[in-house]
Regions:
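Surface-exposed interaction/ligand-binding surfaces
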Residues: 1-190
Length: 190
């Protein structure tokens, strides 16, 4: 993922949270509610300034050059003489490039994650002869760290002559583990 940080600062203090207005970026997925908020301070020319940083996580869907558009940011500052002053500022366009590692050049489906876990459970009995009409259920769970569930591609099930496959609607959901996004996709077939 790409994390875009928007930082604003004042030599006073903020009256309320800074808001980064929504923006579109073609061929990317920007998660709803992915905006993280960080309040802090820093020293500028010997003075302490208050800062508010907003981070937005973006998942590019292909390699190439992207142009982050101008983004409108709404701020509210407590001033010394004029009370609360509200306004907005715009960022400048920024370009960034996404490249696909050579190892993935000919791979159609992959998961971008530092850690992927695969769990398979089944009611199949090893070394059993199955008869016509017997059913075996399999549940496949894919868990990806730091990647939303929507980025886990659907599993492909081969067509086998004489065998019917019935697939339930996949369960797809995201959770957070100590502030880290965890995506999970569960597919059940019989």
């Amino acid at each position: 993922p790409i994390i875009v940080s928007f930082e604003v600062s004042t030599n006073r203090w903020f009256a309320k949270g800074t808001k980064v207005n929504d923006f579109e970026l073609a061929n990317t997925i920007k998660l709803a509610n992915s905006e993280n908020s960080i309040n802090g301070t820093k020293r500028i020319n010997g003075e302490t300034w208050s800062t508010q940083t907003r981070e937005v996580t973006i998942f590019p869907q292909k390699a190439g050059t992207f142009t982050l558009p101008e983004v409108n940011i709404e701020i509210s500052v407590n001033t010394e003489h004029d009370g609360i002053v509200e306004g907005s500022i715009k960022t400048q366009q920024q370009n960034f490039t996404v490249t696909l590692p050579k190892a993935l050049a000919n791979i159609e489906h992959f998961i971008v994650s530092p850690m992927v876990e695969l769990n398979v459970t089944s009611n199949a009995i090893t070394h059993k002869d199955y008869a016509i009409g017997d059913a075996v259920s399999i549940e496949i769970e894919v868990i990806s760290q730091q990647s939303p569930a929507m980025m886990i591609p659907p599993l492909e099930h081969p067509i086998i002559n004489g065998i019917s496959i019935y697939q339930k609607t996949p369960k797809i959901f995201d959770t957070s583990n100590r502030g880290q996004l965890v995506g999970k996709r569960i597919e059940s077939i019989t």
